[in-house]
UniProtKB/Swiss-Prot annotation:
Changing I12T: Loss of localization to the host mitochondria. Mg(2+) binds at E132, D167. Belongs to the Nudix hydrolase family. This is mRNA-decapping protein OPG122. It comes from the Viruses. A motif (Nudix box) lies at residues 126-147. GO terms for molecular function: metal ion binding; phosphatase activity. Keywords: Host mitochondrion, Hydrolase, Magnesium, Manganese, Metal-binding. The lineage of its organism: Viruses, Varidnaviria, Bamfordvirae, Nucleocytoviricota, Pokkesviricetes. Changing K129A: 90% loss of decapping activity. Its EC number is 3.1.3.-. One of its GO terms (cellular component) is host cell mitochondrion. Decapping enzyme that remove the protective 5'-cap from both host and viral mRNAs to commit transcripts for decay by the cellular exonuclease XRN1. Preferentially targets spliced mRNAs and since all viral genes are intronless, it preferentially targets host over viral transcripts. Acceleration of the turnover of cellular transcripts promotes the shutoff of host protein synthesis and therefore diminish the magnitude of antiviral response.
């Protein structure tokens, strides 16, 4: 059970009706608590990511493979040298091969680890910049990470999903707001226009009807929730992200 005290969940509960029962999904490095709400009042928060679970026209779920693992990003970010070394020595299995090589040289250490190549997957999105609203944040992040213009993206804003992510490796909590959407492109068309960048190494596409892992469980919860009646919502059913950006 997740005992993290969210900074915004009390406000979300106060102004938005809960739409579905919360679920908890987990793997060997993360515990994620998801709760769906009818979108009655939502605002951007500077410490909460906004992400989109997007379906292609050939019914695939778009997922991004991060260039850097979560652990590597944390090791680089932290200034505490003791913590850097401890994370590296204790959890090097959660790094990819290149990261292990770089850090082994940096610390002059060679941890006993399997020769695995870690890949951390995420949904497109990120932290809103100063002054950005939800549509603007999603438009920018999807363009930067996946190279898709907002004119191809349609978002269901009738509801949203609040997620609390506990990273059990680095012992930190993160919050995220998920929206469900569609892309008026096939998975092949998206791959053709995608350009590997400093955040995203490549793309993968999941089958919404079968699979395993955290990203599949998140998508299944979101897509099942999308079938429910969102009485009292103040959003739109698959509105163009471009139009949402212009309207706001």
């Amino acid at each position: 059970m997740n005992f993290y005290r969210s900074s915004i969940i009390s406000q979300i509960i106060k102004y938005n009706r809960r739409l579905a029962k919360s679920i908890i999904c987990e793997d060997d490095s993360q515990i994620i608590t998801l709760t769906a709400f009818v979108n009655q009042c939502l605002w951007c928060h500077k410490r909460v990511s906004v992400s989109a679970i997007l379906l292609t026209t050939d019914n695939k779920i778009l997922v991004c493979n991060r260039r850097d693992s979560f652990l590597y990003s944390e090791i680089i970010r932290t200034r505490n040298m003791f913590r850097k070394k401890r994370l590296f020595l204790n959890y090097s299995n959660y790094l990819n091969k290149q990261e292990r090589s770089i850090l082994s040289s940096f610390f002059s250490l060679d941890p006993a680890t399997a020769d695995n190549d870690r890949i951390d997957a995420i949904y497109p999105g990120g932290i809103p910049k100063r002054g950005e609203n939800v549509p603007e944040c999603l438009s920018r992040e999807i363009k930067e990470e996946v190279n898709i213009d907002n004119s191809f993206v349609f978002i269901d804003t009738r509801f949203f999903i609040h997620g609390i992510i506990e990273d059990t490796i680095i012992n930190k909590f993160f919050e995220v707001i998920f929206f469900v959407g569609r892309i008026s492109l096939t998975s092949d068309q998206i791959i053709d226009t995608f350009k590997s960048n400093h955040e995203i190494k490549d793309l993968i596409f999941l089958d919404p009807n079968s699979g395993n892992g955290l990203q599949y469980e998140i998508a299944k919860y979101a897509l099942d929730t999308a079938k429910l009646k969102c009485y009292g919502h103040r959003g739109c059913y698959y509105e163009s992200l471009k139009k949402l950006t212009e309207d706001d």
